[in-house]
């Protein structure tokens, strides 16, 4: 019966693990809807502020804002990387880091230096291993982040761009498509695309009256746009994290259930074998008498 006891111990251990993964699945599921609503709530604001900036670019075309000017020469590229603080979310971080590293290698082949600002412990650990210089990091950020909780981390990167020390800035994170699909995405944050603004301007013919002037309003709005873009990217990544964790824990719970059935079958066979052996020994003893 020693083999049966070992199997029974394994079953008990797997059931204990299954309870944990089931609980984590339920916790993630309870958060998914809330963080998705928070994430989706910011998308209309992002669309409208892009339209306003597009018209402001047209109105102040005589003096192009520094955030819109393409550099003559690129020496240093910055990445704002948004990862998770915790694991157990499937391949979410792994896929993101693969995409990021391919992009970094492409920039390094061009002779560009790399610096980064990182959200989340997983990203910090990855870029430290890759020996990428980190300008700033933020860990344990909230599930429904507010702008003032995030802007401190991105200021060193933005200031580096303003001083001309960084010529390009990319924002890297997962974009939520649906509960089953999270897409790692790299988007150029600075310099902002003038072509994008022209396209938006051509589509909408209305205009504003600017007070005091279009340039000062554009400066303020571009700063708000950068802050909100980072906030929205963090919100998207959190929604991806919760969905990925829910699916990962559901898969783990299902696998645990299948393993329990398999172990239970082995246990029954081992117990049957032990009982058959005992009966055989009893019958053999009776025959001997």
UniProtKB/Swiss-Prot annotation:
Keywords: ATP synthesis, Cell inner membrane, Cell membrane, CF(1), Hydrogen ion transport, Ion transport, Membrane, Transport
Protein origin, superkingdom: Bacteria
Subcellular location: Cell inner membrane
InterPro entries, A to Z: ATP_synth_F1_ATPase_gsu (IPR035968), ATP_synth_F1_gsu (IPR000131), ATP_synth_F1_gsu_CS (IPR023632)
One Pfam family hit: ATP-synt
Gene Ontology biological-process annotations: proton motive force-driven plasma membrane ATP synthesis
Keyword Calcium assigned: no
Membrane topology qualifier: Peripheral membrane protein
UniProt keyword annotation of Protein biosynthesis present: no
GO molecular function: ATP binding; proton-transporting ATP synthase activity, rotational mechanism
SUPFAM superfamilies given in the database record: ATP synthase (F1-ATPase), gamma subunit
Cellular component, GO, one term: plasma membrane
Family classification: Belongs to the ATPase gamma chain family.
Function: Produces ATP from ADP in the presence of a proton gradient across the membrane. The gamma chain is believed to be important in regulating ATPase activity and the flow of protons through the CF(0) complex.
Record HAMAP family: ATP_synth_gamma_bact
Assembly and interaction partners: F-type ATPases have 2 components, CF(1) - the catalytic core - and CF(0) - the membrane proton channel. CF(1) has five subunits: alpha(3), beta(3), gamma(1), delta(1), epsilon(1). CF(0) has three main subunits: a, b and c.
The protein's name in its UniProt record: ATP synthase gamma chain
Organism phylogeny: Bacteria, Pseudomonadati, Pseudomonadota, Gammaproteobacteria, Cardiobacteriales
